[in-house]
C-alpha cells in the first residue's frame, strides 16, 4: 500500500464515522484583546520619603501608642506586617530602594565641583578605580611619589593640625555633611586659638591613609573626615578619625573615633564642636586613642 492509497483509506474511515459528511477543520487563532493605555500626568511617590519611625503597618495593634513610641527609639524596621508568610509589597520595595541608595553611595564619587568649591587639595591613593578600591584596601592607604609631592607642596610643614577629607565608602556622606562640619570645627578651634588651612581631599581613601599624610606633613594632629560604609538606615553617615602624630603601621588603638555623624545621628554641627575639643585635648596631652583620658 502506497502513500496515496493510505490517505484514501483514512478519508473513507473518517467519512463513515461522520455519517458521510466531511468538514473542513480550521485552526483556531487566539484573538488578542486590545487594552487601552491611559497616560496620566503626575509622578510616582518616592517611597524613601516615608519616615519608617512613624509608619506602623500592623493592623489593629494591641497598643498602638506603645508601638509607635518604641519605633521612635530605633530606626529598625519594626511593625512591618505580612501577607501570608511574606512581607508586604510596600516593605519589600522600601528595602530594595534603601539597598539601592547604599549601593549608589559606594560606587559614586564626590562631586568635583564640591571639591573645587571647598578649595580642597585633591589627591588620589594608588587605587585606579572603585573595583580596585573595594578589592585592594591596602592600596587605599598608600600614595605614589607624585601624590606625595603634591601633599608636601601644598601643606604647611609641622603644623599643629592637618584636616583631611576622604570619600571612603560613602560619597553621599561627604556631600551631605562636609559643608556643615568644617565651619563648626573651625569655630570651635577659635576658642583655643587654633586654626587650620589647606585641607586635603583623598579619593579612594582608606582610614590608614591619614597615617601616611601625618608622616609627610609632620602635623601634630591629623583629623580625617571620611564616609562610612552605608547601610539600610542611611547612606550619609560620616566618621572622624583623629590621631596624635600618626605613623604608618601604628596600632588602631591610637585613633580616636567619632562615628554616626549625620542628620539622624550626631548632627554635623554638634560633632564639629566635639572634634575641636578633642583636638585641643590631644595637643595638650600629646596623645590620642585609648591613651587620651
Curated annotation (Swiss-Prot):
The record lists adenosylcob(III)alamin as bound by 207, 228
Q: Name one GO molecular function term.
A: ethanolamine ammonia-lyase activity
Query: One Pfam family, short name please?
Result: EutC
Write down the EC number: 4.3.1.7
Q: In which pathway does it act?
A: Amine and polyamine degradation; ethanolamine degradation
What cofactors does this protein use?
A: adenosylcob(III)alamin
Q: How is the cofactor bound?
A: Binds between the large and small subunits.
User: InterPro entries from the entry?
Assistant: EutC, EutC_C, EutC_N
Subunit-structure text:
The basic unit is a heterodimer which dimerizes to form tetramers. The heterotetramers trimerize; 6 large subunits form a core ring with 6 small subunits projecting outwards.
Which protein are we looking at?
Ethanolamine ammonia-lyase small subunit
